[in-house]
């Protein structure tokens, strides 16, 4: 087999069918490639624009036989205006301070992640994530990745977001937060914070991953409008917009 690291064109592979984590009774397949070679940053940029997501040093996208429910979506930053509910969430979290960190895992982050997973996703695919798994998720990257930490005035870590810095935007890879503060709506707030950060950096988009038609877990993404969806004709306005 050709060594991908010595070629300019990536080698793509496809997974065996696995139970779908979003739609009960469905099975998913993924096409993926390794972010290797001399230009992993430009490769990740191009693949993200083509609907791929990054997990460690792999870029993947759904390739299911009889289902197209997973749709890559991104927020159009310049046209986004927070409504009343979003403004309240922004005000509620005005005390939090954001610090961009290198992609380095810490015990403090992992402790917060465990509280989040145990409270919010105890039955999910990441429920058994170990400390070493977390280190791999954060640190196994060949591209420009940051881990944004959000802290209260007393220094307490309240939320964190693993984010890829792209040529045309920010891609939210994974985020987690303190589950004991539901009144803050921290998950929503981190998306809003990324939109404002992208605006300050003159970046046109915030990539939110996949909206899954029929999945309640992914329905929240349509609240951030205007939203674009990747279609067979390219990026177009999402129907919810």
From Swiss-Prot:
Q: Which reaction does it catalyse?
A: N-terminal L-glutamyl-[protein] + L-leucyl-tRNA(Leu) = N-terminal L-leucyl-L-glutamyl-[protein] + tRNA(Leu) + H(+); N-terminal L-aspartyl-[protein] + L-leucyl-tRNA(Leu) = N-terminal L-leucyl-L-aspartyl-[protein] + tRNA(Leu) + H(+)
Q: Identify the gene encoding this protein.
A: bpt
Q: Which species is the source of this protein?
A: Parvibaculum lavamentivorans (strain DS-1 / DSM 13023 / NCIMB 13966)
Q: What is this protein called?
A: Aspartate/glutamate leucyltransferase
Q: What is its main location?
A: cytoplasm
Entry similarity comment: Belongs to the R-transferase family. Bpt subfamily.
Question: What cellular component GO annotations does this protein have?
Answer: cytoplasm
Which Gene Ontology molecular-function terms are recorded? arginyl-tRNA--protein transferase activity; leucyl-tRNA--protein transferase activity
InterPro entries (UniProt xref): Acyl_CoA_acyltransferase (IPR016181), Asp_Glu_LeuTrfase (IPR017138), N-end_Aminoacyl_Trfase (IPR030700), N-end_Aminoacyl_Trfase_C (IPR007472), N-end_Aminoacyl_Trfase_N (IPR007471)
């Amino acid at each position: 087999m050709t060594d991908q690291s010595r070629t300019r064109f990536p080698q793509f592979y496809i997974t065996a069918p696995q139970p779908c984590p979003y739609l009960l009774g469905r099975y998913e397949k993924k096409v993926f490639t390794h972010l290797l070679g001399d230009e992993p940053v430009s490769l990740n940029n191009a693949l993200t624009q083509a609907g791929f997501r990054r997990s460690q040093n792999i870029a993947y996208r759904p390739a299911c036989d009889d289902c197209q429910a997973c749709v890559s979506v991104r927020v159009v930053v310049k046209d986004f205006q927070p409504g009343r509910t979003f403004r309240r969430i922004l005000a509620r979290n005005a005390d939090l301070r954001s610090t961009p960190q290198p992609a380095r895992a810490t015990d403090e982050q992992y402790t917060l992640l465990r509280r989040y997973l145990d409270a919010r996703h105890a039955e999910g695919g990441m429920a058994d994530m170990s400390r070493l798994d977390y280190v791999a998720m954060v640190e196994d990257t060949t591209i420009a990745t940051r881990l944004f930490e959000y802290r209260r005035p007393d220094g307490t870590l309240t939320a964190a977001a693993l984010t890829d810095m792209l040529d045309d935007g920010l891609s939210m890879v994974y985020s987690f937060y303190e589950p004991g503060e539901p009144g803050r709506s921290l998950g929503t707030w981190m998306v809003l914070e990324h939109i404002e950060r992208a605006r300050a950096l003159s970046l046109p988009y915030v990539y939110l991953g996949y909206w899954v038609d029929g999945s309640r877990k992914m329905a929240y993404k349509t609240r951030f409008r205007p939203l674009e969806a990747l279609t067979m004709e390219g990026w177009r306005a999402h129907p919810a917009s």
